[in-house]
Amino acid sequence: MNKSQGSVSFTDVTVDFTQEEWEQLDPSQRILYMDVMLENYSNLLSVEVWKADDQMERDHRNPDEQARQFLILKNQTPIEERGDLFGKALNLNTDFVSLRQVPYKYDLYEKTLKYNSDLLNSNRSYAGKQTDECNEFGKALLYLKQEKTHSGVEYSEYNKSGKALSHKAAIFKHQKIKNLVQPFICTYCDKAFSFKSLLISHKRIHTGEKPYECNVCKKTFSHKANLIKHQRIHTGEKPFECPECGKAFTHQSNLIVHQRAHMEKKPYECSECGKTFAQKFELTTHQRIHTGERPYECNECAKTFFKKSNLIIHQKIHTGEKRYECSECGKSFIQNSQLIIHMRTHTGEKPYECTECGKTFSQRSTLRLHLRIHTGEKPYECSECGKAFSRKSRLSVHQRVHIGEKP
């Protein structure tokens, strides 16, 4: 590509966060950011290295020596001992240290290099720049490949070009970029994605495509992961084992629910019903069931709640907000927990097991109702005749007899 066509700089493929914004990202978002950024840099480098090589030949320099100078980190072993990184496109899987093995902070630069790309931004346009600028990028790149701090290299070595790397605040640029690079746009709803594979999966919500079929019952799925989960129903496979008691489960979520029984200590006991809780505030909230206290009121409809979280969830009914969308059928929900329960209709997952008969259920509430068969509990009593029922719905049906309404 000649210069008249324009060149792509590292800045063009860079997304930066302020320190405050970075601290708000959770670990999975940070890893995704690094996945995107390192892929961008490696792709750009694979193109720009050749441009640099052509430039060196035009300048009658020694290409091998220039390449060596570009990629060698000062005071480290020669590039020949590190493998042939020059002369081929860098491979994200082999030429960079695994992102999940790199800590979120390096000791370098007063522990402020939090996966930010400012080390690379000093090279505004790679092609045609001086060798020392190339070396600066090479140093930063190889630093990622090392799994330890280069204690033999002074801080000043990284600041030769006088770029904004000399103090802590300069590590984070003042851009207000809120989202990661998302170049793949859905033509149906304009939702954006970082990777093409995610866009392809998402489009199945609109097209209804379900390319993954169970070879036992012929049920189809839009995602392979859901098919794999579903097939465990047929195979009986239980890959998730509790390290405490050895009990195995079909799905990881089943194991997580089970492990709570081992992990939780519940020293706070309700004097009314004997139920125990891990924290005192949970007991206080629970006791409102017995006292009837409902301190949280909806300003739209005046409905009251004994938990603030229940009020917040309820208010979404008025706003119409449904943030959680099913990737299988596109149905959306107010709460993430509702989506999780709904997804089990697609996967067939039933994480709640009856300890009496082994029957499994997709919802905890359904298990509770089922347990009354074994315990004989009938908490719903007719005020007219005293007959008791295990379920409120059955009491409602029964009461129609007294008022003359046909069930």
UniProtKB/Swiss-Prot annotation:
Zinc finger (C2H2-type): 184-206, 212-234, 240-262, 268-290, 296-318, 324-346, 352-374, 380-402
Gene3D superfamilies: 6.10.140.140, Classic Zinc Finger
UniProt keyword annotation of Metal-binding present: yes
Chain segments annotated as transmembrane: none
GO MF term set: DNA-binding transcription factor activity, RNA polymerase II-specific; RNA polymerase II cis-regulatory region sequence-specific DNA binding; sequence-specific double-stranded DNA binding; zinc ion binding
InterPro entries: KRAB, KRAB_dom_sf, Znf_C2H2_sf, Znf_C2H2_type
CDD domains recorded: KRAB_A-box (cd07765)
Gene Ontology cellular component terms for the protein in this record: nucleus
Classification via SMART domains: KRAB, ZnF_C2H2
Does not affect nuclear localization pattern: annotated span: 171-404
Chain residue ranges for the region called Required for correct nuclear localization and exclusion from the nucleoli: 2-167
Annotated compartments: Nucleus
KRAB domain residues: 8-83
One Pfam family here: zf-C2H2
Positions bearing the Glycyl lysine isopeptide (Lys-Gly) (interchain with G-Cter in SUMO2) cross-link: 74, 114, 145
Signal sequence interval, chain numbering: none
Alphabetical keyword list: DNA-binding, Isopeptide bond, Metal-binding, Nucleus, Repeat, Transcription, Transcription regulation, Ubl conjugation, Zinc, Zinc-finger
GO BP, one annotated term: regulation of transcription by RNA polymerase II
Annotated function: May be involved in transcriptional regulation.
Family affiliation: Belongs to the krueppel C2H2-type zinc-finger protein family.
Name by which UniProt lists this protein: Zinc finger protein 1 homolog
Organism: Homo sapiens
Encoding gene per record: ZFP1
